[in-house]
């Protein structure tokens, strides 16, 4: 019993010393001391360590939130700087004339042109083709050496709703070497009358046949009064009179 009282007095002295030196003592601690829950020095240590752990946890959470918020703000500021600041453009490099890997489609015409009721597998393969640009517009990248390569594909026929697998051979063309070659333009010689002749040759001619239809008029009959007169001179004199 005396030990408990001594413990209680030492705790009160410690609390007063702490309140005088630092922050005020919370009222929750007084309530826990007034209660009979503290019966030994171990209970007091648990109480003090529990409060310190809670405070340390709160400080740790606060530090973490500050660090996260600071990191997010820093990342946002970096993002704004990167968006706002102009990016450094790298120099352009010409695509030189050389062989490159391209994708070529295997159509059904390469296997069988008479039948369309089948599938080809694989539908496309890789080939080597010349590509690139040259220094002049009059020069193009063209292959100087080619090689035929045979590949085996599957021909899947559908007969009476059943699949029949067959093998077929397709010949592919690979480019081995490339070079920029001059494009030869066709020489066009023009003569003074050639332009009109070329235009006449280009424009399609349509033949138009015109048929003249003669309409037969009924013969002019003489007046009944002058039927008996056959002499034209006498008839003219009679009409003139």
Curated annotation (Swiss-Prot):
SMART domains: PDGF
Keyword Transport: no
Region of interest (Disordered), ranges: 217-241
Signal peptide: 1-20
Keyword Cell membrane annotated: no
PROSITE patterns membership: PDGF_1, PDGF_2
Family membership: Belongs to the PDGF/VEGF growth factor family.
Subunit structure, interactors included: Antiparallel homodimer; disulfide-linked. Antiparallel heterodimer with PDGFA; disulfide-linked. The PDGFB homodimer interacts with PDGFRA and PDGFRB homodimers, and with heterodimers formed by PDGFRA and PDGFRB. The heterodimer composed of PDGFA and PDGFB interacts with PDGFRB homodimers, and with heterodimers formed by PDGFRA and PDGFRB. Interacts with XLKD1. Interacts with LRP1. Interacts with SORL1 (via the N-terminal ectodomain). Interacts with CD82; this interaction inhibits PDGFB-mediated signaling pathway.
Main function: Growth factor that plays an essential role in the regulation of embryonic development, cell proliferation, cell migration, survival and chemotaxis. Potent mitogen for cells of mesenchymal origin. Required for normal proliferation and recruitment of pericytes and vascular smooth muscle cells in the central nervous system, skin, lung, heart and placenta. Required for normal blood vessel development, and for normal development of kidney glomeruli. Plays an important role in wound healing. Signaling is modulated by the formation of heterodimers with PDGFA.
Protein name (Swiss-Prot/TrEMBL): Platelet-derived growth factor subunit B
Organism taxonomic ancestry: Eukaryota, Metazoa, Chordata, Craniata, Vertebrata
């Amino acid at each position: 019993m005396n030990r408990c009282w001594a413990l209680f007095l030492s705790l009160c002295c410690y609390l007063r010393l702490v309140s005088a030196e630092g922050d005020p003592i919370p009222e929750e601690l007084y309530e826990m001391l007034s209660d009979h829950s503290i019966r030994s020095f171990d209970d007091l240590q648990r109480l003090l360590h529990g409060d310190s752990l809670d405070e340390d946890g709160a400080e740790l959470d606060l530090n973490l939130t500050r660090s996260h918020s600071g990191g997010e703000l820093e990342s946002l500021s970096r993002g704004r700087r990167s968006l706002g600041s102009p990016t450094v453009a790298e120099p352009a490099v010409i695509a030189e004339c050389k062989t490159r890997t391209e994708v070529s489609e295997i159509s059904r015409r390469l296997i069988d042109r008479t039948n369309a009721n089948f599938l080809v597998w694989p539908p496309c393969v890789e080939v080597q083709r010349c590509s690139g640009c040259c220094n002049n517009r009059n020069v193009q990248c063209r292959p100087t050496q080619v090689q035929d390569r045979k590949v085996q594909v599957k021909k899947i026929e559908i007969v009476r709703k059943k699949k029949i697998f067959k093998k077929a051979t397709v010949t592919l063309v690979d480019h081995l070497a490339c070079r920029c070659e001059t494009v030869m333009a066709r020489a066009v010689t023009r003569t003074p009358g050639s332009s009109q002749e070329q235009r006449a040759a280009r424009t399609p001619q349509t033949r138009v046949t015109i048929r003249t239809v003669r309409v037969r008029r009924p013969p002019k009959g003489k007046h009944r009064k002058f039927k008996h007169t056959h002499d034209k001179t006498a008839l003219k004199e009679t009409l003139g009179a």
